[in-house]
C-alpha cells in the first residue's frame, strides 16, 4: 500500500495535469497515475516518416487563459493559422451568414452547432475573437510533455481498476490518499465513479495525405459546406516542421465513416487537383473526440462528486482545452482551500 501523497490523480490529460500543477505549487503532494505511455490524454501526436501527425485536428488558442498562463506556447514556437478577416474559405454555395459560419463551427464542435448549448457557442465565439488558434513545433504531444515536465510523480503504463473509499487499486499497486481526482475520459470515469452520468461523445476521423506537387493557398483552412469531409488544410503550410521532407501534408476531417478513395475524391474537389497520386500517410479514428454539450447543460458541472472524490475533464466543463484545464483548476482550488484555508 502506497500512501505518501495527499492527492491521487487518475489520468494525465490536460485536466489532471492542471490540477497537479496547482496542487504541487501549493505544496500539496500529488501522484498522477496514467494508463498510457505519455501525458496529454487526447492531446497527442505521432511521428511517421518525418511527418508530425496529431490525433485529431489539434490547435492551441492563445486566448485560453490556462494556455496563456502556462507560458509554453512562445517557448514551443507557436505559429497561428492564417490571419485576416476570413482565415478560412468555404467550399460550397454561401447564401446567408449561417452558411458561412455553421460549417466552420461544425468542425469545432464535431457536431451540428444547433445541437450545442448557446452558452458554449458564445464561449467559443469569444475565444476566436480574442486569439488566433495555431500549432507548436513537435505537434500536440510537445505541449503535453512540456506541461507535464514540472510534475514530480507521474506513473505511466499503469491501469486503474477501481476506487474503494480512499484507495485506488491499479494493476501495479494500491494507493491511498485523503482526496482523489478522476481525470479520465468520460467512459472510464463512469466506470470508476458510479455517481456520475454517462456523457455522449462525438467521434471524428482525421486523414493525412502528402504530395510533392504543391497546392498554392492550401494553408488557408478549407471548410466544406456539404460533403463527407468537413474541413481540410495543408497543415505543413502552417507549421513547416510537420513535414521534414518538404512535401505538403494535408489534414482532413470527417464525421462519418467513408473510404479512403472517397476522401481522395473529396480532396480533389476541395483543392481542384488530381489527388490520385497523393500519398496516404495515416488515418486516426477517434471515437471519443469531444463531449457533446446540449442546451440546458451548465457551462461547468460540479467537480466534487462526494467528499474527497472529484471528477474533472472537458466533459465536466465545456468541450475545449480551456474547459478541461479549468475543471482541473477548480478541483485543485477546492482542495487547496480545504488543506490551506488561510490561502483561500
Name each model feature, range by range:
Residues 162, 167-270:
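Mid-domain catalytic core of redox enzymes
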Residues 84-166, 174-177, 183:
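Active-site/ligand-binding neighborhood in enzyme catalytic cores
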Residues 48-107:
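Dinucleotide-binding Rossmann-like beta1-alpha1 core, especially the glycine-rich loop
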Residues 5-32, 336:
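N-terminal Rossmann-like FAD-binding beta1-loop-alpha1 element of flavoenzymes
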Residues 24-48:
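Glycine-rich FAD pyrophosphate-binding loop
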Residues 15, 38, 187:
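Conserved Rossmann-like nucleotide-cofactor binding loop
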Residues 240-344:
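Conserved flavin/dinucleotide-binding core of flavoenzymes
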Amino acid at each position: 500500500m502506497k500512501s505518501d501523497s495527499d492527492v491521487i490523480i487518475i489520468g494525465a490529460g490536460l485536466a489532471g495535469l492542471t490540477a497537479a500543477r496547482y496542487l504541487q505549487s501549493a505544496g500539496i503532494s500529488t501522484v498522477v497515475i496514467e494508463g498510457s505511455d505519455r501525458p496529454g490524454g487526447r492531446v497527442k501526436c505521432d511521428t511517421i516518416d518525418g511527418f508530425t501527425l496529431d490525433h485529431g485536428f489539434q490547435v492551441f488558442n492563445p486566448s485560453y487563459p490556462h494556455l496563456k498562463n502556462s507560458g509554453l506556447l512562445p517557448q514551443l514556437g507557436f505559429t497561428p493559422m492564417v490571419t485576416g478577416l476570413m482565415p478560412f474559405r468555404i467550399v460550397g454555395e454561401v447564401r446567408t451568414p449561417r452558411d458561412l459560419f455553421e460549417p466552420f463551427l461544425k468542425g469545432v464542435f464535431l457536431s451540428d452547432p444547433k445541437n450545442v448549448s448557446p452558452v458554449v457557442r458564445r464561449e467559443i465565439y469569444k475565444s476566436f475573437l480574442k486569439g488566433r488558434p495555431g500549432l507548436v513545433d513537435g505537434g500536440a504531444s510537445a505541449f503535453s510533455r512540456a506541461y507535464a515536465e514540472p510534475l514530480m510523480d507521474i506513473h505511466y503504463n499503469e491501469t486503474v481498476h477501481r476506487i474503494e473509499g480512499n484507495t485506488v487499486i491499479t494493476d501495479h499497486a494500491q494507493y491511498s490518499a485523503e482526496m482523489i481526482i478522476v481525470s479520465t475520459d468520460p467512459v472510464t470515469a463512469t466506470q470508476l465513479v458510479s455517481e456520475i452520468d454517462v456523457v455522449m461523445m462525438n467521434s471524428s476521423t482525421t486523414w493525412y495525405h502528402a504530395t510533392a506537387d504543391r497546392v498554392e493557398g492550401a494553408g488557408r483552412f478549407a471548410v466544406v459546406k456539404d460533403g463527407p469531409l468537413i474541413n481540410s488544410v495543408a497543415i505543413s503550410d502552417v507549421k513547416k516542421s510537420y513535414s521534414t521532407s518538404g512535401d505538403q501534408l494535408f489534414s482532413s476531417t470527417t464525421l462519418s465513416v467513408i473510404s479512403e478513395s472517397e476522401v481522395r475524391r473529396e480532396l480533389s474537389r476541395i483543392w481542384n487537383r488530381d489527388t490520385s497520386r497523393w500519398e496516404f500517410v495515416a488515418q486516426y479514428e477517434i471515437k471519443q473526440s469531444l463531449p457533446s454539450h446540449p442546451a440546458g447543460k451548465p457551462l461547468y458541472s460540479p467537480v466534487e462528486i462526494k467528499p474527497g472524490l472529484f471528477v474533472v475533464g472537458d466533459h465536466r466543463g465545456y468541450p475545449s482545452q480551456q474547459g478541461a484545464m479549468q475543471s482541473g483548476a477548480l478541483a485543485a482550488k477546492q482542495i487547496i482551500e480545504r488543506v490551506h484555508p488561510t490561502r483561500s
